[in-house]
Amino acid sequence: MMRSGRRGHLKQVATLGMGSLLPSSLFFHEILSYTKSQRMTQQNSPFYHFRIGAIEATVISDGQTLFPPHPLYAVNTTGEEVINALESHFLPTDLYRLQCNTLFLAMGNEKVLIDTGAGNTLGPGMGHLILHMSKAGIAPKSISTILITHCHLDHIGGLMHEGKPLFPNATLYISEQELNFWQAKNIDLNSMPIEESFKTNFKKAFHDNILPLNDRINTFRFNEEIVPGIQAIETTGHSPGHTSYWIRSGSDSLLHTGDIFHHPAFDLEHPSWATAFDQDPPKAYKTRRKILDMASFERVPVMSYHMPFPALGHIFARGNHYGWESAPWIL
């Protein structure tokens, strides 16, 4: 179902200079300072209840942080194109509002959480998962299973706090490919055009949040059913073992896509645009096009971790571009 015109997009992705670093204005500590300088107040509910067949599901926000939008989330295009994309979506052109949204699934005796937020790794706007779970009436100790899409810091940073597990009764599931990459003696992040201190924070997040839970980790291979009703789908490229999850109950389903795409104005509408955090940009692009084609053609309900809250919707195709139809808010 891959659409025509992708060769030109692949060429654009392939020309990305992986050896170059982002401008010094995007150094990690300055990103955090940028976040702190912005107004980051919560105005609305941080959780959203819905159903997938017999499954009681809840999207829970971990919070948000702010980044300069270019080139971090559109490395291989121009600042002018990014401004045009943001303006076409009626969005500010001087900042990118990155949201993190976890998914809780009540499946009988199984209480499943997909990803855990950023914890303390991305400044004060993030790391609110536990607080927001309590507002939704969900106890961390009730979580029996945690599914990790990939081991980037904004997905695993909420596993531990001050050396103690925040989900004391949970078993973790991580793809075998992903865990093998991050457990290597020398973790190779050279393909990511970000400053070295940012790479160090990625490695530290894995060391602080995954390694202490080693005796609770189970690995899986792609296409396996992790728990009844949830299947692991290979969507590698953004990370070496990036996993999406098919969630099925009766005739209903939801595809959790993790970080295949990040924002309607960027790598959804322009799937060839790579982020600085794509570890294999050409492969990430191929995966993105494959999943976007499938989701739009089959009209599959989707949850995407970084999409604007509640991060639920449908993908529709517009030639070589795609759009996002957000799920209607249900009171």
Which positions does each model-derived feature cover?
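Conserved beta-strand hairpin/beta-sheet module of binuclear metal-dependent hydrolase folds
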Residues: 46-136, 244-259
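C-terminal segment of N-terminal export signals and the immediately downstream linker at the start
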Residues: 24-59
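Metallo-beta-lactamase
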Residues: 127, 134-138, 142, 176-234, ...
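Cap/insert and terminal regions of metallo-dependent hydrolase folds
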Residues: 250-331
